Each structure stands twice: as structure tokens, then as C-alpha cells.
Regions:
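N-terminal regions that are enriched for targeting/export leaders
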Residues: 2-5
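N-terminal glycine-rich anion-binding loop in soluble enzyme alpha/beta folds
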Residues: 8-103
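Alpha-helix N-cap and loop-to-helix initiation/capping positions
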Residues: 79, 143-146, 172-175, 179, ...
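Short, solvent-exposed amphipathic alpha-helices that sit
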Residues: 83-91, 146-154, 213-228
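Long, hydrophobic, well-ordered secondary-structure blocks that form the structural core
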Residues: 105-179
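Hydrophobic alpha-helical segments within soluble ligand-binding/sensing domains
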Residues: 174-195
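Redox- and metal-dependent alpha/beta enzyme cores, enriched for Fe-S-associated oxidoreductases
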Residues: 206-233, 239, 245-253, 258
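Conserved small/polar residues in nucleotide/adenosyl-binding loops
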Residues: 260-268
Length: 271
């Protein structure tokens, strides 16, 4: 039952990629199966890919990934989820005294708390307007596009669909560029200015770029805007891409190749 006559509520859904429930083989298998089964992430024929995924990748990768997650896991659990919850609390505190009709939830594309669960909470709070904010500054079909798919898949089952605004990018927003620049300056104050700053973005297959994905261009522009904002020269800043998966060519230059084939520490690189 909906309340009538009261001021309509605005729901804000903050989303991110996600995290396993625990840093062990069992939970990583569940998480990776959901993540790597997303057709936005892996653009290969479904039947062929599912055979590879189920018979090869999910037999090997969960154990290796679990060990990596154990290295970053804290007493509060997943760092990504902990950060997301702290961000949520600060945002809620900021708005609570200004507008009690705005409510917030966090939803992860993969793992928990899920986007469907977060939207259900907002539905129960009777939101009539919905703002979706994926925490991806640069639009990419594999991240922002996938989030849009999940949100709309849920909303299309609702009887009363709220008015929705979906923020699909903010890679060139002034406040974002200033925040990045201030973060770098703050680090310099604690250490020293390096000879070169490496902006390392998560990579995607080069094929996605040639098929029209703007992600690569948006990453380059973010780097350029930070460079201009901080008054740096071309020699003082560089864009690279990390986390290559499989044998296919991904966006270059690879961060790993830069660090492993050069004396990065001796040359004063800061990633």
C-alpha cells in the first residue's frame, strides 16, 4: 500500500562491481560464475563460453582468486563493500538534515548486497523518483551498461515504475577532476613528487573498442584533464591498462609490461 498525500520520496541507488561474500574457494566460485556469465563482460558465443567457464576457469581460478582476496580482506570484510557502506553513511548524514524524503541504498552488480535487493528496499520505502549512480567515472558497456541492464530488468517487473535518471559517466566533471588532483597532491605532501604519474585503468579487450565502446577515449580524457588541471607536462603523466584476462589483445599499454620491463622504482614512477 502506498501513502497518499505525502511528499514523494526520491531513491538513490549507488552501485559498484561487487565482491564475494568471503575470501574462499566456494564463495569465489559463486562470484566468478555470476561475473563471468554476464554477456556484457564476456562477448563470446554463450554455449562455447559456458563450456570453457564451467570446465576450465571455474575449476582453477577460484582458488587463486581466493588467495588474492585474503591479502586484502580486513576484519570488516570486503574492502570494497566497507568503503561503499562508509560512503553511504556519509552521504546519508549529509542529506538527512536537509531532505528526509531522499533515501539511499547500495547495490552490487555481482554478489551482495545485490542490485535487486537494494531496489526492493527502495520500493518498500515507496520511492517515486529514482537516481542510479554507478561508481564508474568512465562509461563502459561491461560495467555501466551491465548495471543499466540489471536495473531495468528489475524495474520492468514492477507494477508502478518510478521516474528514473541513470548517470552513465562523469569522467570529465570538474569536481571529479579536482578530487583526483587533490588526492595526488595530498600523496605528494606525504612523500615527494615522482618523475612520472601512471594512471592505470582496468582494461578491456581491444575488440570492444573497435566495436564502438568509448571507454578507452574517456580514460585518456580523464588523464589529460588531470594533467592540465595540475599543470603537468606530457612527460610527467601516462595512461596504462591493467588486469588483462585471457590471451586476447586488450587495451595498451599494459601496466604490467611497463612495470616489469622498466626500472619503475628507480625512474620514480607513481601508479
Amino acid at each position: 500500500d502506498y501513502e497518499h498525500g505525502s511528499k514523494e520520496k526520491i531513491g538513490v541507488l549507488i552501485t559498484n562491481l561487487g565482491t564475494p561474500d568471503a575470501p574462499n574457494k566456494k564463495e569465489l566460485k559463486v562470484y566468478l560464475n555470476q561475473f563471468l556469465s554476464d554477456p556484457r563482460v564476456i562477448e563470446l558465443p554463450k554455449i562455447l563460453w559456458q563450456i570453457i567457464l564451467k570446465l576450465v576457469i571455474l575449476q582453477i581460478r577460484p582458488s587463486k582468486s581466493a588467495e588474492a582476496y585474503k591479502q586484502i580482506w580486513t576484519d570488516k570484510g570486503s574492502p570494497l563493500l566497507d568503503i561503499a557502506n562508509r560512503q553511504l553513511n556519509k552521504i546519508q548524514s549529509s542529506f538527512s538534515s536537509k531532505n528526509e524524503n531522499i533515501v539511499f541504498e547500495v547495490g552490487m552488480r555481482y554478489g551482495n548486497p545485490s542490485i535487486p535487493d537494494a531496489l526492493l528496499k527502495l520500493q518498500k520505502k515507496q520511492v517515486r523518483r529514482l537516481l542510479v549512480l554507478p561508481m564508474y567515472p568512465q562509461y563502459c558497456a561491461a560495467t555501466t551498461g551491465s548495471t543499466f541492464d540489471e536495473v531495468t530488468n528489475v524495474l520492468q517487473k514492477w507494477r508502478w515504475i518510478p521516474e528514473m535518471r541513470f548517470i552513465n559517466q562523469y569522467f570529465e566533471e570538474k569536481n571529479y577532476i579536482e578530487a583526483l588532483s587533490n588526492s595526488i597532491k595530498s600523496f605528494w605532501e606525504k612523500t615527494s613528487k615522482p618523475q612520472k604519474i601512471i594512471f592505470s585503468y582496468h582494461g578491456i579487450p581491444k575488440r570492444y573498442l573497435t566495436n564502438g565502446d568509448p571507454y578507452h577515449c574517456f580514460c585518456l580524457k580523464t588523464t589529460r584533464l588531470v594533467k592540465e588541471h595540475m599543470g603537468l607536462s606530457d612527460d610527467e603523466i601516462m595512461t596504462t591498462f591493467q588486469s588483462r584476462f585471457g590471451r586476447e589483445e586488450w587495451l595498451k599499454p599494459y601496466t604490467s609490461c611497463l612495470l616489469y620491463t622498466s626500472d619503475a622504482a628507480d625512474e620514480g614512477f607513481c601508479v
